[in-house]
Amino acid sequence: MKIPLHKLLISSTLVTPILLSIATYGADASLSPTDSFDGAGGSTFTPKSTADANGTNYVLSGNVYINDAGKGTALTGCCFTETTGDLTFTGKGYSFSFNTVDAGSNAGAAASTTADKALTFTGFSNLSFIAAPGTTVASGKSTLSSAGALNLTDNGTILFSQNVSNEANNNGGAITTKTLSISGNTSSITFTSNSAKKLGGAIYSSAAASISGNTGQLVFMNNKGETGGGALGFEASSSITQNSSLFFSGNTATDAAGKGGAIYCEKTGETPTLTISGNKSLTFAENSSVTQGGAICAHGLDLSAAGPTLFSNNRCGNTAAGKGGAIAIADSGSLSLSANQGDITFLGNTLTSTSAPTSTRNAIYLGSSAKITNLRAAQGQSIYFYDPIASNTTGASDVLTINQPDSNSPLDYSGTIVFSGEKLSADEAKAADNFTSILKQPLALASGTLALKGNVELDVNGFTQTEGSTLLMQPGTKLKADTEAISLTKLVVDLSALEGNKSVSIETAGANKTITLTSPLVFQDSSGNFYESHTINQAFTQPLVVFTAATAASDIYIDALLTSPVQTPEPHYGYQGHWEATWADTSTAKSGTMTWVTTGYNPNPERRASVVPDSLWASFTDIRTLQQIMTSQANSIYQQRGLWASGTANFFHKDKSGTNQAFRHKSYGYIVGGSAEDFSENIFSVAFCQLFGKDKDLFIVENTSHNYLASLYLQHRAFLGGLPMPSFGSITDMLKDIPLILNAQLSYSYTKNDMDTRYTSYPEAQGSWTNNSGALELGGSLALYLPKEAPFFQGYFPFLKFQAVYSRQQNFKESGAEARAFDDGDLVNCSIPVGIRLEKISEDEKNNFEISLAYIGDVYRKNPRSRTSLMVSGASWTSLCKNLARQAFLASAGSHLTLSPHVELSGEAAYELRGSAHIYNVDCGLRYSF
């Protein structure tokens, strides 16, 4: 049968020998569920051995399992063996499992024993190999063995668990092979608790290996390769590429010379390279070895991150400290780290020993003459060294160019390389070795940022910087060149770590080696909070930068810095001011001391608190709503005495503008009132209202309000004929009969506010205050009635009003570490609405429908503002709210529905537009007349 080669193709060119070893033809043999075996009852499994030069292909026609084969008496051979050609298993979507196999000194499950002949598993929904052989098989030699290629392709779930290679000279607890391909598998692949006496607790490959294009998670956990490669042992250039997710955890290399807790890729006399690239997620956690590479030991390692990549809590050492807490590079080897589409992080990796110090932080060890060829991060990505790099005393002369792109790469390597001691514990911070990274190479910074943080020291042979790149250093950090010069074009000092007498230190150790800085210092606040620190409310002096040359201060060239010490700071929030510099020279050093001079304060958006004056507009909205409802109740169908109650909801929103955040006010509540009409058809109404509100700036502030309101409404009906007017003959006679409706309204509100400010970087603050508001409305309208038969509306009521609202905010102080004090403020708004009310009356005169349209012009306004200050420092500013548009359009629609001679149902909805501000309210009420 012809084997479909497209099923076996893999992405890496490293596996070409594998493809050449796959036979094109072979004899088919069927495996059906009847071929399953369970030796628990004492039956004996007969191994299947073939010798076909064209190979053997087992094709499954159902799920097959082999359990307890060799129980009691070891099998005479591997469960499946091909001694001449290729051995292939085609799953057809079925599952194949081996559980507890004892094949003596043979491979447990399957073997292809002829040189360069392949062993292949393809097309299975599930492959499972458990204890085949297990730990009790003293002479066991792996689960799968191939003298040529071993291929696991296009399968679903794969599990290798508790498989061992106990034979003293055998590698690979689960798999031992010449070349390896694990590719195109679609579900999880798990290697757990496998072990080998030599290399590769899970997998060993003597030639090219490729693990690529697998879309499920690959897990290598708790495997043990005693001499090296707790999970993977490779002795030739190999690749792990384009996989979805890889997780290496708890793998160990336990021999006294054990290397590579998770992966070993090395061979005496050869220079193999391990390539790890294109994987969407990669984690090495809590792996360990004895001598080199807690996670990886390799001659060459090319690691490119296509997603988050983490080396965490790996360790190397035993009675004596090892080399490379996470990664060890062999003598004359090379390391390339590229954060292309995800960060690379080294955190908590250590060298351990039984003597003090028992634990020392370390990320990478570079052997004698080993070098880093690439150290780069794409734009927006970073490489974090929270653990230092160590190097053999013999370094490499090759220049390490940080963030250097490939000649044919479109990637912009302008990311950040970070060396930091910020995540050391208090005990770890006592050891200088936990802060010091040593690279025995000259460094050149081509692009992006090299950042030194948390008191670290970076020792290199020499350092040069290209225009456009940034060297960022926190006070307390040091850049040291041991043999060559330092040349800087842009030095940025991170003020967020400014403390005590710590300075940025630049030092050369080579005789007559120079230090050059061609531009002023640039100050950066990476935390965003330095200029908010109250310690700089007053002038202070701080040692900031020290340049030290090995021979003489004359080797220090910082003329640009002496002329203009600090670039003009970018606009920032917080305390405003400027820096002044003084310089002191010794025979070998030049030291700069900076003095901060405070000139003012510019609050950041979190502190401005425009919600406080905005709350007056919220009170304005609520009291205006009450007046609208009072007017609507005066237009009820039955004007006699009555009691009424109404529920109402208000919504006020204004957009963000300039430095002011958006503001939203919502309130809801109830109104109860009473009305009476005298014999002259004058209407008297009084009402009480309680509203519950929420105010937000759509940022970090929330205010809860309780509003109590009362209103008195008066309406008087007259005729134009009662007013003095010029005579126009018959027109005057007609005008005299038009009803004139005059009204007046006086309202008051008391609002209690409780504000919470949830800062992003400071403790929460609380404050409470009250608003007191009064409103006056005077108006008049004409009542023009048409016959009932008129279409559309029968009543037309053009009106003109004068409205005045005064609202005052009480002064108050917040509670909390970052509390503010607010002076009182007030709002005055006088407006003249002009419009028309249209009324439709039902034929039985029991129901009506009204529409009102009005233009509102504000003729006078005092916009609210509040003087605000920080209680801890006295810094102050004015909290302003957005000034609403002075022209508005108001539209409302309402109805009165008579349910009985004494009961009336009413409802109204209104919308007011003021530029970028919107006010909505709705109410529904019930009236009882008597």
Curated annotation (Swiss-Prot):
<keyword id="KW-0998">Cell outer membrane</keyword>
<keyword id="KW-0472">Membrane</keyword>
<dbReference type="Pfam" id="PF07548">
    <property type="entry name" value="ChlamPMP_M"/>
</dbReference>
<feature type="domain" description="Autotransporter">
    <location>
        <begin position="636"/>
        <end position="930"/>
    </location>
</feature>
<feature type="signal peptide">
    <location>
        <begin position="1"/>
        <end position="26"/>
    </location>
</feature>
<dbReference type="GO" id="GO:0009279">
    <property type="term" value="C:cell outer membrane"/>
</dbReference>
<keyword id="KW-1134">Transmembrane beta strand</keyword>
<dbReference type="InterPro" id="IPR011427">
    <property type="entry name" value="Polymorphic_membr_middle"/>
</dbReference>
<comment type="similarity">
    <text>Belongs to the PMP outer membrane protein family.</text>
</comment>
<dbReference type="InterPro" id="IPR005546">
    <property type="entry name" value="Autotransporte_beta"/>
</dbReference>
<keyword id="KW-0812">Transmembrane</keyword>
<keyword id="KW-0134">Cell wall</keyword>
<dbReference type="GO" id="GO:0005576">
    <property type="term" value="C:extracellular region"/>
</dbReference>
<keyword id="KW-0732">Signal</keyword>
<dbReference type="InterPro" id="IPR003368">
    <property type="entry name" value="POMP_repeat"/>
</dbReference>
<dbReference type="InterPro" id="IPR036709">
    <property type="entry name" value="Autotransporte_beta_dom_sf"/>
</dbReference>
<keyword id="KW-0964">Secreted</keyword>
<protein>
    <recommendedName>
        <fullName>Probable outer membrane protein pmp8</fullName>
    </recommendedName>
</protein>
<dbReference type="Pfam" id="PF02415">
    <property type="entry name" value="Chlam_PMP"/>
</dbReference>
